[in-house]
């Protein structure tokens, strides 16, 4: 019995080794799981479910194969792929979840999320996030021709990279008070998230008790997953 969590794969055709590693993960490790949760940024960018990128179809087929084998797959949007919609969810068999979800995992209540909402010290990013998550912004964007959406997305990624290069690492990490507030709001002692690309298990105090924040790593030269069993919560790095 095990439930698996991954995040921040940033899949793109320019990184075939990561794509191949994910396909192998779906065919091997994930097939033995009770469920797979993808906590955002599965893709490097997403400009709409109507994008004919062959990689998207390939990933949908692979995830659907996992689901059809009896392993449910759940997805929380990240900051790169927040426009993944019902069409891709239907094609891949994934179940879309809200940005925060509490799970009962073998007797543990675990809060899961992408993690970008915890980085409250980065006021500029939070303002940008609020804007692009506004349905009144998303709907007009999704009606634009694909070539225009690609240009806008490329410009936004370049702008984000430039902005991040001038920010301190502390600003781009989670805010400790925000973490505790979220865990106490949901009355949990466990939190699993991604986004920061800083894999670690942090011990803290919440609800007057010891608590744990488990941060998934990004997939680069190796993969990263959290494996939850009735007896343990493990952060695991593995070769792609």
From Swiss-Prot:
Mn(2+) 1 binds at residues 8, 10, 41, 197. Binds 2 Mn(2+) ions per subunit in a binuclear metal center. Mn(2+) 2 binds at residues 41, 79, 114, 195. Substrate binds at residues 79-80, 122, 160, 164, 167, 195. Pathway: Glycolipid biosynthesis; lipid IV(A) biosynthesis; lipid IV(A) from (3R)-3-hydroxytetradecanoyl-[acyl-carrier-protein] and UDP-N-acetyl-alpha-D-glucosamine: step 4/6. Its cofactor is Mn(2+). GO terms for molecular function: manganese ion binding; UDP-2,3-diacylglucosamine hydrolase activity. InterPro entries: Calcineurin-like_PHP_ApaH (IPR004843), LpxH-like (IPR043461), Metallo-depent_PP-like (IPR029052), UDP-diacylglucosamine_Hdrlase (IPR010138). The keyword Cell membrane applies. It is a peripheral membrane protein. Belongs to the LpxH family. This is UDP-2,3-diacylglucosamine hydrolase. It comes from Salmonella typhi.
């Amino acid at each position: 019995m095990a439930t698996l969590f991954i995040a921040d794969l940033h899949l793109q055709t320019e990184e075939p080794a990561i794509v191949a590693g994910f396909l192998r993960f779906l065919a091997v490790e994930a097939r033995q799981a009770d469920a797979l949760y993808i906590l955002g940024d599965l893709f490097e960018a997403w400009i709409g479910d109507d994008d004919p990128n062959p990689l998207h179809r390939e990933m949908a087929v692979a995830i659907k194969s996992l689901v059809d084998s009896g392993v449910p797959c759940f997805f929380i949007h990240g900051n790169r792929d927040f426009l993944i919609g019902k069409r891709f969810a239907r094609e891949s068999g994934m179940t879309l979840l809200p940005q925060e979800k509490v799970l009962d995992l073998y007797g543990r209540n675990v809060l899961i999320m992408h993690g970008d909402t915890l980085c409250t010290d980065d006021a500029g990013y939070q303002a940008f996030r609020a804007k692009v998550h506004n349905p009144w912004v998303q709907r007009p964007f999704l009606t634009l021709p694909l070539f225009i959406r690609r240009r806008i997305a490329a410009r936004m990624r370049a702008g984000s990279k430039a902005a991040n290069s001038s920010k301190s690492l502390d600003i781009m990490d989670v805010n400790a008070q925000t973490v505790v507030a979220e865990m106490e709001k949901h009355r949990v002692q466990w939190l699993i998230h991604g986004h920061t690309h800083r894999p670690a298990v942090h011990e803290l105090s919440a609800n007057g008790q010891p608590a744990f924040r488990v941060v998934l790593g990004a997939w680069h030269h190796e993969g990263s997953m959290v494996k939850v069993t009735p007896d343990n919560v493990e952060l695991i790095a593995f070769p792609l």
